[in-house]
Amino acid sequence: MPLKHYLLLLVGCQAWGAGLAYHGCPSECTCSRASQVECTGARIVAVPTPLPWNAMSLQILNTHITELNESPFLNISALIALRIEKNELSRITPGAFRNLGSLRYLSLANNKLQVLPIGLFQGLDSLESLLLSSNQLLQIQPAHFSQCSNLKELQLHGNHLEYIPDGAFDHLVGLTKLNLGKNSLTHISPRVFQHLGNLQVLRLYENRLTDIPMGTFDGLVNLQELALQQNQIGLLSPGLFHNNHNLQRLYLSNNHISQLPPSVFMQLPQLNRLTLFGNSLKELSPGIFGPMPNLRELWLYDNHISSLPDNVFSNLRQLQVLILSRNQISFISPGAFNGLTELRELSLHTNALQDLDGNVFRMLANLQNISLQNNRLRQLPGNIFANVNGLMAIQLQNNQLENLPLGIFDHLGKLCELRLYDNPWRCDSDILPLRNWLLLNQPRLGTDTVPVCFSPANVRGQSLIIINVNVAVPSVHVPEVPSYPETPWYPDTPSYPDTTSVSSTTELTSPVEDYTDLTTIQVTDDRSVWGMTQAQSGLAIAAIVIGIVALACSLAACVGCCCCKKRSQAVLMQMKAPNEC
């Protein structure tokens, strides 16, 4: 048989097979060769028929179906996944899911269900995931789930539940994920979860819970995530989590917690994320956190904390992110951050800090980003960053800084982001070392806002980087010499140097210091080959050399910079919600 005949036969067989696959597909639906059926559209008001007998996945979405009658899926017993979402569904007849013994996934989310018939899920012996979220359910009863012994995931969030009766989940011994968030729960019985020994994720966020009784979580020995944020909890019982040794993520943010019992976090060796932001905490006592050797993130912003004592975080040896912004912190003890040798991100912005001890950050050898903006800092010790050699980003904007110590940033070779704007900089002769360092490291300041002078009044509003500072010199008679050329402004660059920049105190002499020295030396009439005095020639040469070096540094920053500018997604927050719905 010629080759073209084989090809025609092959095409014909494929077309015939495709016709079989699509046989029985309703006109309102689309059916694929992979036994997947999707029925969507407002024109659909009832379950389309006939459905393909071999369908394994059926989706009915965005229709005007208001009820499911008995046995609409009787002829598709091989169905494994059924999604009936975003419809007008308000009533389901018992027996609607009859003959679906192979069904493993059932979603009735985003409908208008208020009541679940008893026995609705009878016969669904293989069901593993049941999604009832975003409906209008008013109550659940133990009989609703008594036939779902294989269930692993139950989603009930986004309903109108006010109470969970004892025994509601007693038959769900294999359940690993339970979501009860976004309801109207005001109270949880200490016995409601006692048979859920395999549960790994429990979410109770965005309810109206005011307290959690002792023993509520005692039976949840395998729990890994507990979400209690956005409730009205005012007090935590000391032993509330003492039996949850496998807990990894604990969300307690946006409640009314005003104090933490001394032993509340003592039995959580696996915890790696703890959120307490948006509460009413006023103080943190030493040892309150720990021992938690695996904690990586601690979120404490938006509280009323006023001070940080010594060793308050000393048990958190692996902590990498510490967020203390938007509190009322006015004092930090020199040993407050003892033990935080692995910390990468420290946020202290928007507090009431006026002064910092020179040793307060000495233990933070691995710190990369520090946020100190929106405080009242008047000065910084010269050794404030002495042991923090890996800093990449420093936020100091919107403080009360008038100057900074000589060489404060010289050793920070990895620094790629420095924010100094919105400070009342005093642009007199004392500002020259800082001005010269900024001139040589201008790309690190960013392109949005640069620091400007606040005083004296005659230079207010002028850029600190390009300002000409009049240096007072001894009163001696000197011939007229050209004024020192204005420091050139170099274009900003999005890149940042990845090696230590030349500072004003090391390899390059301060240009204004040269100017001062030259004007105090007795000047002769000897002229150079350019027709200048020696002082004029030296001044011109110094200006040219400094300009070339500054330009070279700026160009090197443009070409060679690959400094990491990574910013923790926790500080930008945003101050956004830390766990999924």
UniProtKB/Swiss-Prot annotation:
LRR repeats lie at residues 54-75, 78-99, 102-123, 126-147, 150-171, 174-195, 198-219, 222-243, 246-267, 270-291, 294-315, 318-339, 342-363, 366-387, 390-411. It is found in: Cell membrane. It holds the Pfam family LRR_1. Residues 1-21 form the signal peptide. It is a single-pass type I membrane protein. It comes from the Eukaryota. The chain crosses the membrane at residues 539-559. Keywords: Cell membrane, Glycoprotein, Leucine-rich repeat, Membrane, Repeat, Signal, Transmembrane, Transmembrane helix. Residues 489-509 are annotated as: Disordered. GO terms for cellular component: apical plasma membrane; extracellular exosome; extracellular matrix; extracellular space; plasma membrane. Residues 423-475 form the LRRCT domain. Residues 22-538 are extracellular. Expressed in brain and placenta. Expressed in lung fibroblasts. Expressed in chodrocytes. Induction: In fiboblasts, expression is strongly induced by TGFB1. In chodrocytes, expression is induced by IL1B. SUPFAM superfamilies: L domain-like (SSF52058). The keyword rRNA-binding does not apply. InterPro entries: Cys-rich_flank_reg_C, Dev_Immune_Receptor, Leu-rich_rpt, Leu-rich_rpt_typical-subtyp, LRR_dom_sf. The keyword Signal applies. (Microbial infection) Interacts with human coronavirus SARS-CoV-2 spike protein (via RBD domain); the interaction is direct and sequesters virions at the cell surface. This is Leucine-rich repeat-containing protein 15. It comes from Homo sapiens (Human). The gene is LRRC15.
